[in-house]
C-alpha cells in the first residue's frame, strides 16, 4: 500500500505525515508538495528539512503559474467564494499527478485537517473518489496548533517564520484570495511588497473587466460589498478600524470549486 501525504508546508501536514510514518513505516510514504510559485522562501526550506527529518521521499509538482497569472488567464479574480487558483494550481495539478502515478486500490491519500475541522472532511473524500482519503490529525491524541508547533521544535525543526509572524498558515507567501481583513493587514505589515503586488493585480482586473470586484467583501448595514486592498490599505494608514479577527484563509484541497 502506498501512502501519499499532501504536504503544504504547514505544521498540521507535518504532524499528519509523522503519524502516517509512525503507523506504516517510511518506505511507502511520499510527501507531495504542490507549488503555487509564490510560496515564502522559508516554506521551501521547511518542506525540505521536514522530508529529511521524516526520511521520506518528497515530490514537488507545479502547474508553473502563480495565482495572479491564473486570475488574468481566467479573467476572474479569486475571492472568498470561488478560488480558481486553488482549483487549477492545487487540485487539478495534484489530480493529474495522482491519477497518472497511482492506483486507487493500493493508494491512500492523507490531508492535514485536524479534529476541529471534521465538517470539512466530506468534500475531499467526494472530490478524490475513487481514492481513499484519511485525516490523521482528526484522531486522538487531539492536538492544537500550539501543540503541533511544539512537535516541530521537539523534532529539531525551525518553525516556519510565517507562524512566528502570526499568520494562520504557511501557504502562498501569506497571500490568499480567501483571506479576510485581519490576514491581509498582516500581509501589509510584514510583506508590503507582496501586498502591493496583490493590490495592483486587483486594481488592474477591476479596470480590465470594468467590474466592482475584489478579493474581500465587507458588510455595510448588513449588506456584503466589495472591499478592495486599496481601501484596506487606506484604512490601515488612516488608522481607521478594521476587523482584525476576519482571518479567512486557505481552503485548498478542501473546498471543491
PLM features: what roles do these ranges have?
Residues 1-257:
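Nucleotide-activated chemistry modules centered on ATP-dependent adenylation/adenylyltransferase
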